[in-house]
Amino acid sequence: MLTSLLLATVLQAEAIGGYTAGCLKNAMALPLEGPGYQVIRTKRLRYYGHPDLIHYLQTLANQTRMAGLPDLYIADLAMAHGGPFTTGHRSHQTGLDADIWFRMANRPISKWEQDAPKEWALIDEPSYKMLPGRFGPQQLTLLRLAASKPEVARIFVNPVIKSAVCQQAGDEPWVAKLRPWVGHFSHFHVRLRCPAGSPDCEQQAPIPPGNGCGAELASWLKDKPQLPKVSSINKMPVLPSRCRN
């Protein structure tokens, strides 16, 4: 933690703008492997983040390791200067978002597997039901550790996964941070709050009161939510002036 804080101070790391229209100043790269985790899809060069995010991920990986879980697979963070991706996510622009797979690593992976890892969906898309044996104690522990940290603003999960958590741990306060969203069949998406020293970072609206296990979740499960059209995902956002200079 001290190293991250010192680097953030010396380099004046900043998250600028909003999660879906912003950039990142003086990012840190997450080492491609470390205690309790491995970075995947490294050819995308999306393993940069604000120092707070790097510290969060390394701390989480240490905690999951101590809890007896296999290594985490960490996927997209942000690009070196943040900003919009050319493909995929609309967010991940300010170095405060990270994708973590529910599938975990029981062994070091090869370079080929690192670049093209096999996805492990928890949900059968046609039926929109949980696949048997895919969401167990390890996945619940991972979500509990990931969501319990105060710097976490919210975690996006598939509504079916949120429902499973509500059934098993609905009375625990961290469950409120799990927000249902489309997709996310094989991973969850952590989003941190705006960090200190980033005056131009735009906070997202607070999550609603309650654990989110009631009528709101039921509305997501009533009809299978549809993914946004590709054209709307890839539309270039209007970036803050500091991101255009």
What is each stretch, according to the model?
Residues 3-12:
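Hydrophobic alpha-helical targeting segments used for export or membrane insertion
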Residues 65-67, 91-96, 147-148, 181-184:
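Extracellular/periplasmic catalytic domains that process cell-envelope and extracellular macromolecules
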Residues 12-75, 135-142, 149-152:
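Active-site acidic/histidine clusters and adjacent loop/turn architecture
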Residues 17-24, 28-29, 83, 95, ...:
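Glycine-centered flexibility motif
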Residues 79-132, 190:
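Acidic/His-rich structured neighborhood in mature extracellular/periplasmic domains
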Residues 56-89, 156-177:
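Extended, low-complexity, intrinsically disordered C-terminal regulatory tails
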Residues 114-245:
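Catalytic cores and adjacent binding grooves of peptidoglycan-active enzymes
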Residues 4, 71, 97, 154, ...:
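A residue-level signal for beta-strand positions that form part of recognition/binding surfaces
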